[in-house]
């Protein structure tokens, strides 16, 4: 309803794209065949893991590339993307863009994600202190991932803040390319 759909590498938001997709399949095909239908989709996508993990991975890594191909590099969904570490990603529908969207994205999603990383890092710090040697290696690797994502997201938050303060209005008649460029610092690069 707020035109912001987070794409996460874990279940951080109730309304992330994977959760919404699962809910869509549940509503259309029913609860009884949900797992079977998710497995069908996951098998079609390919990849390793549970059906939900495969679907999550597709949205995180491949969906936007497919979307750009479909729309010949003039996307109607825009991917807000913090960078290679996947610190933060979210889709918005261009035709529903409103000038306060970046402020909402920043406060309702970016800040929320930053808080999740702080919580995860605190919990991992405690767990590492009390872990066995083999477990410590695994937890330290997770900690490094979260530290990298948090650092990436901190830099990204500053860029989003700068653009949010500008309260940018778009004119759909200017076209996707022009409007996308207004937000180039915070959107995925079109390749």
Per-region residue spans from a language model:
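Terminal accessory regions of large proteins
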Residues: 1-191
């Amino acid at each position: 309803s707020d035109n912001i759909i987070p794409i996460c590498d874990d279940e951080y938001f109730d309304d992330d794209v994977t959760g919404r997709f699962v809910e869509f399949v549940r509503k259309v095909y029913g609860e009884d065949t949900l797992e079977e239908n998710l497995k069908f989709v996951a098998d079609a996508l390919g990849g390793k893991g549970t059906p939900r993990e495969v679907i999550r991975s597709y949205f995180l890594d491949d969906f936007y590339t497919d979307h750009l191909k479909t729309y010949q590099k003039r996307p109607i969904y825009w991917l807000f993307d913090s960078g290679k570490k996947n610190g933060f990603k979210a889709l918005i529908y261009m035709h529903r863009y409103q000038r306060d969207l970046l402020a909402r994205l920043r406060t309702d999603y970016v800040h929320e994600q930053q808080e999740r990383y702080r919580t995860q890092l605190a919990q991992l710090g405690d767990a590492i202190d009390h872990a066995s040697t083999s477990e410590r290696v695994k937890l330290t690797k997770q900690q490094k991932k979260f530290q990298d994502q948090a650092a990436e997201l901190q830099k990204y938050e500053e860029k989003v803040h700068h653009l949010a303060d500008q309260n940018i209005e778009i004119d759909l008649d200017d076209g996707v390319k022009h409007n996308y460029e207004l937000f180039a610092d915070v959107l995925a690069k079109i390749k």
